[in-house]
A protein has these predicted regions:
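Short beta-strand scaffold segments in enzyme catalytic cores
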Residues: 81-84
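Structural signature of cysteine-dependent C-C bond-forming condensing enzymes
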Residues: 1-14, 22-76, 86-88
Length: 88
């Protein structure tokens, strides 16, 4: 993506593992972030693996102009889900 890399964040650090509800809660949080026009920071992030240094990850919440978000969830037993959401 180069300079156009989409912002990256994570919610699990703040909500813990909610077992079956995790994916649904993260989808709601992604929609709320879109509604507010922000990308939530990851304040517990101490360092970034050098292999991912080009990704726009931040400890601080920052403004963002987007109407779409990609929510990725993984479950036990190899279950994976990708949900692309758009703000109304």
């Amino acid at each position: 993506f180069g300079a156009d890399a989409p912002p990256v964040t994570a919610f699990k650090w703040s909500i813990g593992h909610l077992i079956a509800a995790a994916g649904a809660i993260e989808a709601v949080l992604a929609l709320e972030a879109l509604r507010r026009g922000v990308v939530p920071g990851i304040p517990v992030l101490d360092r970034i693996d050098p292999a991912f240094a080009a990704l726009p990850v931040s400890r601080e919440t920052r403004k963002a102009r987007s109407d779409v978000a990609l929510v990725l969830s993984r479950g036990f037993g190899g279950t994976d889900c990708a949900l692309l959401v758009r703000a109304a």
